[in-house]
Amino acid sequence: MTDFLEIRPLTKEAFTPFGDVIETTPSSMRHINGGQTERHHALSAPEAAGEGARIILNIFRGQPRVFPHKIDMMERHPLGSQSFSPLSGRPFLVVVAQDDGGRPARPQVFLARGDQGVNYRRNVWHYPLMPLQAVSDFLVADREGPGNNLEEYFFDEPFMIAEPSL
């Protein structure tokens, strides 16, 4: 029997166990530069553990996913957080899972708007980038440095995601 995962809207409250939702709110804004710029302050705090580690910025260009889509694996980064902020203004899917004894529990799927990003905390199980509709660019804050910062898990039975309603 095929196990389809429910897609829910991305909210700060629902995503808290996994990391931060990166989005502007009136409470995050303050004026700088003589009132000419709105700064949305401290939306997330990237992590980079280990000697010689640092936070770097990258641009990832993701191909749109085809649906229904099979979730057969997840990954996590034990030494650093990883954030994805869309530059193309398009929605994307975010797939995360709680840890269950060193493996991912049942995945949860969130639909992020084109003006929302996410920061996965260290050690949070997640599925690779899932753009929708078209090729999409993302600004990614990631850890660079010595040590193995990637762990993958492959499910015995995959989960499925139906095409989201946008």
Curated annotation (Swiss-Prot):
Keywords: Lyase, Purine metabolism. Pathway: Nitrogen metabolism; (S)-allantoin degradation. It is an enzyme of class 4 (lyase). Its cofactor is Ni(2+). SUPFAM superfamilies: RmlC-like cupins (SSF51182). It comes from the Bacteria. It catalyses: (S)-ureidoglycolate = urea + glyoxylate. GO terms for molecular function: ureidoglycolate hydrolase activity; ureidoglycolate lyase activity. InterPro entries: RmlC_Cupin_sf (IPR011051), UAH_cupin (IPR047233), Ureidogly_lyase (IPR007247), Ureidogly_lyase_bac (IPR023525), Ureidoglycolate_lyase_dom_sf (IPR024060). Signal peptide: none annotated. Its EC number is 4.3.2.3. One of its GO terms (biological process) is allantoin catabolic process. Belongs to the ureidoglycolate lyase family. NCBIfam families: PRK03606.2-2, PRK13395.1. PANTHER family: UREIDOGLYCOLATE HYDROLASE (PTHR21221), UREIDOGLYCOLATE LYASE (PTHR21221:SF1). Catalyzes the catabolism of the allantoin degradation intermediate (S)-ureidoglycolate, generating urea and glyoxylate. Involved in the utilization of allantoin as nitrogen source. Homodimer. This is Ureidoglycolate lyase. It comes from Agrobacterium fabrum (strain C58 / ATCC 33970) (Agrobacterium tumefaciens (strain C58)).
